[in-house]
A protein has these predicted regions:
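Helical hairpin unit composed of two closely spaced alpha helices linked by a short loop
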Residues: 180-212
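Flexible beta-alpha connector loops of hexameric P-loop NTPases
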Residues: 127-130, 154-159, 191-204, 234-241
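Short, small/acidic-rich helices and loops at N termini and domain boundaries
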Residues: 1-34
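The Walker A/P-loop phosphate-binding site
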Residues: 23-122, 142, 150, 342
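C-terminal regions of RecA-like/P-loop NTPase motor modules
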Residues: 162-182, 215-217, 231-343
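A short beta-strand-to-loop transition that corresponds to the Sensor-1 phosphate-sensing loop
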Residues: 105-106, 224-229, 264
Length: 343
């Protein structure tokens, strides 16, 4: 009973706080009149936020993604999307940002196990042996000193919408956990707030709902994953393009950045994961990030500059050739040669 009273009370407080904030965002901004404030804000509260992976930041215009961005990871079903998202989330914790991981597919215990494995670099068997409990506790104490938390929530697919996630973020913030990064695994399985029946409309609206949620809750970023079409599987060894996105092309309109997880047979053998840029609003039209993968330990480590240089020498030329052959956007000479600016 007390808990229900607390819920009602915390909602009232939240409402009062929301209403008392000056409605700054509703007002237009002035190019000339606002110069001083704008320059100060750029330094004090940068609106571009780097992600944990250097190579992805390097292919953007400003070394990161604008706040409230919605980014999408593409791959075929049952591939490495969740694996990649777990490692991304781990990176954000190291950047002192609390993460909410909303899962529609795997189950929260499995996701949490993957996080712990990835963090302490152990296999599932080693984790369950109990021999590494001390190591886990030591690692988590270090994260606790950063004042961050990772929250994993399993939600029913096709029923849960962004209003539920919003309530959850508010509830966590009331408990002192300031969620700044949202991972949704995956958004295509959520219901839209408008309760659309048709998949195409539902998915389009879910992405709009997520964008609105990111802005309203002042999230740094939202990452989600999405499946590719059957046709898209042909591009797994090269690079996906925007027509490979299953379910709704509107995702391209509403996402800030879309990357695909690719690898050739040789790269698979060498445990290399290649993250290829499909489309982004503010940065280079093409580019990639490379990672060394250990799926057994759920760990994905970014290439060093030296490893990247070696990779480009060994694989680079061959890869560029096959990219041009596959009717990829890079076969369009003009687009390929355009190496900067908005696209």
């Amino acid at each position: 009973d007390n808990f229900e009273q607390y819920e009602t009370y915390s909602r009232k407080i939240e409402k009062i706080l929301q209403n008392s904030k000056p409605k700054k965002d509703d007002e237009p901004i002035f190019m000339i009149r606002d110069i001083t404030e704008r320059q100060f804000k750029r330094q004090a509260e940068p609106s571009v936020i780097p992600c944990p992976f250097r190579q992805l930041n390097d292919i953007t215009n400003a070394g990161g993604y604008p706040e409230h961005s919605v980014n999408v990871i593409l791959d075929k079903p049952k591939a490495k999307k969740t694996f990649f998202m777990v490692n991304l989330a781990r990176g954000y914790l190291r950047m002192k940002k609390s993460v909410l991981y909303v899962d529609t597919e795997n189950g929260k215990e499995q996701i949490m196990d993957r996080f712990i494995q990835s963090s302490i670099n152990k296999t599932k068997k080693e984790l369950y042996s109990g021999e590494y409990d001390k190591l886990e506790a030591k690692h988590l104490r270090k994260l606790a000193r950063f004042g961050v938390e990772l929250v994993v929530e399993r939600v029913p697919a096709m029923i849960t919408d962004c209003n539920y996630i919003r309530e959850l973020i508010i509830k966590l913030r009331n408990q002192g956990i300031n969620i700044k990064v949202l991972m949704v695994d995956y958004a295509g399985k959520l219901a839209s707030i408008a309760r659309d029946k048709e998949d195409f409309d539902r998915i389009s609206n879910v992405y709009i709902d997520i964008q609105n949620l990111a802005e309203e809750m002042d999230l740094d970023i939202v990452w989600t994953a999405h499946h590719i079409t059957r046709e898209g599987k042909k591009h797994r060894t090269t690079r996906y393009d925007e027509n490979d996105i299953s379910g709704s092309i509107a995702i391209v309109r509403n996402a800030h950045t879309i990357v695909g997880l690719n690898s050739t047979e040789q790269e698979e053998k060498d445990d290399i994961l290649r993250c290829e840029l499909v489309v982004q609003r503010d940065g280079l039209p093409s580019g990639r990030a490379l990672f060394k993968c250990d799926v057994e330990r759920q760990r994905c480590v970014e290439f060093t500059k030296e490893q990247r240089k070696q990779y480009d020498e060994i694989y680079g030329e061959k890869l560029e050739e096959s990219l041009k052959k596959k009717g990829n956007p890079d076969a369009n000479e003009d687009k390929y040669n355009k190496k900067q600016g908005d696209i």
